[in-house]
Amino acid sequence: MDYSKTLALPKTEFPMRGNLPSREPQMQAVWEEQNIYQQVLDRTKDRPSFVLHDGPPYANGDIHIGHALNKILKDFIVRYKSMAGFYAPYIPGWDTHGLPIEQAIINAQGLDRRSIEVNDFRQRCEEYAWSYIDKQRDQFKRLGVRGDWENPYVTLLPEYEANQIRVFGEMAKKGYIYKGLRCVYWSPSSETALADAEIEYKDKRSPSIYVSFQVADGKGKLDIETGVVIWTTTPWTLPANLAISLHPELEYNVVKVDGRKFLVANGLIEAASKEIGWEGVEILATFKGQELEGVETQHPFYDRKSPLILGEHVTLDAGTGCVHTAPGHGEDDFNVGQKYNLGVLCPVDHEGKMTNEAPGFEGLFYEDANKVITEKLKENGALLKLSFFTHSYPHDWRTKKPVIYRATEQWFASIDGFRTQMLEAIKNVKWIPHWGETRLANMIADRGDWCISRQRVWGVPIPIFYCKACNEPIINDTTINHVADLFRKEGSKVWFSREANELVPEGLSCTKCDCNDFRKETDIMDVWFDSGSSHQAVLRERGIAWPADMYLEGSDQYRGWFNSSLSTGVAVYGTAPYKSVLSHGFALDGEGRKMSKSLGNVIVPQQVIDKMGADILRLWVASVDYQADVRISDAILNQIAEVYRKIRNTFRFLLGNLDGFNPATDRVAYEELGELDRYVLAKAAKVAKRTRKAYDEYQFHTVFHAVHNFCVIDLSAFYLDICKDRLYVEAPDSLKRRAAQTVMYDCLLSLVKLVAPLLPHTADEVWAFIPGVEEKSVQLTDMPEGDEQHLSFAAEAESKWDAFLAIRDEVLKAMEEARRNKVFGNSVDAKLALYPQTEEVAKTLAAMDDLADLFIVAHVDVHSGSAPAEAVQLEGIAAVVSAADGGKCERCRVVKPDVGTRESHASLCVRCADVVEQHYAHVTE
């Protein structure tokens, strides 16, 4: 007789294989059709809000793995918060102005920026930006990131630009905006000034030269045979030399070498001698730096003097202690030059070419001038040593080319005006990780004024007019409001399409000379001012929340968006625009190396999704400790895919065994559940509580491990394995079977909600198969908190069950050895004789019911005496594993002594015979 039809085997249409690359887009189409994002907002609209404000990616190129890491982390938080009692809108944004798009247009279309009409060029830039917004939007949505994708914020939109103008206006009104001649980072490759945040450091090979400036007037201290020795790595700045700086308190020695006299700082004689190749150095005289102030030296190739001046910036870190000072090419040089009224000489133009203020070197690119200048020094006998070395040097973060210091007139935001307020505001922000506070505070404490002007056209113009008669800059509430209103109506392009007199408010006249003829500023704002104004242009403009609950970006944004947003927030409103800041590390390859095409180690998110699915990539993000740099490779992703498979299989097993289960009518009351069932519910409640805490602390790798371990260890390898007999063999409506189904149902509901923020596609796929749920999506439910009744049971019974599981693990070792020795085939063919070696083990076993079920064997005997010689000695217990007595039941496959005692079903045990006769008579007739 075929008894297989009398078994309640798992049955579900939930597929074993995820087929995520094809199934996820279908799921996303359903979400879009149902407008699930709006449904979530409508459901939670009366709850307290949690606003994670999106830092805008740049609208250029495809998204990379760093983008994926960032957006997925944000999505984890937003999805969790919306299931945890909060109204959590998410408005994605894009940063759209700036040099990279200008450069992309110039390169792609072969344009000469200077020969094309400005608004035509800007229109091409805008079209380019929108094309990549559309592309990146699709790529972010494919990651499963939920948000208001149809209404993002974009820095080129008129309403955004208008808000940015108002932020600028407020800062100007408070006196924080000024125009000044300063030494700033200048990028010849971009032809514009740059801010600190636009600088990155890379290794560069540079010349290292020691040069002698001959004393022309020693002021009674130094004779004219003495050479003052300077050291520089930028020979091209020597045409701009106007002085030599000494530290007032340092000691300087006149030394004699090979018949020549030189001045060098006492603390650097040894190092300089080694570098230059001096031997037999004789000290002739010693002076304090302040004694030599006013001594004049002769410039090594121009007919002018370079005086010795005093500066606190001089150190003994390198060189000679006599510092070549070119106020046009260094911040310290500029500052000390102002003190001594040296003037500013900057003989390098916007392209990095030497001007006619550097006679003999006109037209040379500054780096090419190095060689010619060095040869000139050698010819004049001023070059003491030339060598080359590699050092860390500032580069333009966009073009990757070196930058220089160049004195130019620029617009600045005076950080000194609100530095103290910023440092105070930082203390009121929650920093994750905690070291973020110190990192940003140090940057704020040390930073100079913010250069906010750029000599480009694709950006938001600086809204300032100048009187044509007296050159007075005009900026006030009237002009700012007028320009902001114009931009809101027509966009910033209006600034470039109209003359200044068409842009000014009606009736405007110069406050200084009463003239009413104006010109307009031609510079645009730093793009960090664009994105740094987003708290105003998005959060306040849309009435969402201010300050935001969280900013979340890569750790490079301490000098970027975190910094610029803090600057504008504090300057305008006196406080930080965020309550908390979370930063993550960078994505590296499997060996911890930076990804690069040359190494062939680049992981492309789109390729991962096409091959494995977005939920695999998301699970990888959940698995890593993102606060440090994270690793990703094909091998790592394959490991993650295996974890996913185990989680999915757990879901499938639970669903399969809930076939025919109606939670409304088939649930077993908690009081009627067995102790094992209550123990597993207690474990599930603890997992829910631990997971909620981990989500609240943004510890997603803790969520990952908690869920994975619960699926694999507590369920698959323990409870579900033990329950198979109950589920398949017991009567369909029996208390034991329904009890197991009740536990499985509750575990399934809890698990699918706990993973929903991490694996939204899979969670909603599972949700569609769960019996008795009313909501269309798991996204429209709340997170489990951990049932208090279950948690209180955990407190009572956990130590007992943990002790038993430790014993069980030991006994399973003996069973595995017996299986290898062919004592039995399946565990239900075996019986156990257990010999506790301690009182604790004996008590634990005595307190357990149904030991045979718990060990998944035919029979268990616990003995109090000594273990026989053949027993396997284990930790705290000895065990004898042997073949069970009796016959193998054809239906339940367990070896039992009562098999064959029922004539009508001679191949069954009594239990199975009863079940068949009472519930499956129609099947076996």
Curated annotation (Swiss-Prot):
Binding of Zn(2+), residues: 889, 892, 909, 912
Keyword Nucleotide-binding in annotation: yes
Transmembrane domains' residue ranges: none
GO BP: isoleucyl-tRNA aminoacylation
Free-text comment on this protein's domains from its UniProt entry: IleRS has two distinct active sites: one for aminoacylation and one for editing. The misactivated valine is translocated from the active site to the editing site, which sterically excludes the correctly activated isoleucine. The single editing site contains two valyl binding pockets, one specific for each substrate (Val-AMP or Val-tRNA(Ile)).
CDD domains attached to this UniProt entry: Anticodon_Ia_Ile_BEm, IleRS_core
Protein name, entry field: Isoleucine--tRNA ligase
Subcellular locations according to the entry: Cytoplasm
Alphabetized PANTHER family for the sequence: ISOLEUCINE--TRNA LIGASE, MITOCHONDRIAL, SOLEUCYL-TRNA SYNTHETASE
Entry function: Catalyzes the attachment of isoleucine to tRNA(Ile). As IleRS can inadvertently accommodate and process structurally similar amino acids such as valine, to avoid such errors it has two additional distinct tRNA(Ile)-dependent editing activities. One activity is designated as 'pretransfer' editing and involves the hydrolysis of activated Val-AMP. The other activity is designated 'posttransfer' editing and involves deacylation of mischarged Val-tRNA(Ile).
InterPro entries linked: aa-tRNA-synth_I_CS, aa-tRNA-synth_Ia, Anticodon_Ile_BEm, Ile-tRNA-ligase, Ile-tRNA-ligase_type1, Ile-tRNA_ligase, M/V/L/I-tRNA-synth_anticd-bd, Rossmann-like_a/b/a_fold
Family to which the UniProt record says this protein belongs: Belongs to the class-I aminoacyl-tRNA synthetase family. IleS type 1 subfamily.
Gene3D superfamilies recorded: 1.10.730.20, HUPs (3.40.50.620), Ile-tRNA synthetase CP2 domain-like (1.10.10.830)
Species of origin: Brevibacillus brevis (strain 47 / JCM 6285 / NBRC 100599)
Essential cofactor(s): Zn(2+)
Cofactor note: Binds 1 zinc ion per subunit.
Intervals of motif 'HIGH' region: 57-67
Quaternary structure annotation from Swiss-Prot or TrEMBL: Monomer.
Catalytic activity from the UniProt record: tRNA(Ile) + L-isoleucine + ATP = L-isoleucyl-tRNA(Ile) + AMP + diphosphate
